[in-house]
Amino acid sequence: MPREIITLQVGQCGNQLGCRFWDMALREHASCNPNALFDHALSSFFHNVDRRYTPPQELSVGAGNTPIRFLKARAVLIDMEEGVVNQLLKGSLAELFDSKQYITGASGSGNNWAQAHEVHGPQFSDAILEKVRGEAELCDSLQTFVMMHSIGGGTGSGVGSYILETLHVSAPEYLELQSTTQNQVLYSWAIVRVPRLILFGSE
């Protein structure tokens, strides 16, 4: 039965949403599962690994009564700037991720959909797909991809739409869900806001 979900956090907003999501998922599970067992609900979003071994060994969910050893999120973090991802990797949730799970650029997309979609998307496409493939290989029965992003910025909208197109072609058998954020058009500080919405929607 398909069950695992890989989360793609794209851009500043996507990674900030992801940070809150992982925090809430852990808190919610802890309130429902005080015995700290690695059950099927938790295995949808997390790996349970034993770090006493090198490389760490993946522990099976089994009958849902395996103790939690060390959780790793089923996620890929993507941003064309390093700031937000670096904050996440230094914060309280840092141990959920490792270097195999994130891709950052140095220049940013500058709120420019075209720069993100036409330059950064193709430039980072192979690396992104390789990281997604690595996460998929750790799944017993992958069900879907969930993308968290904003259409109010360059990376979230441009690279986000590029990734969706690429996944649709390379992995059409899996569901693609989006958690898309947009700010109010009337109060946006970026003059390219409305054209970016149109470009994202056209893809």
PLM feature segments, named:
Residues 1-203:
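Segments that form or flank anion-binding pockets
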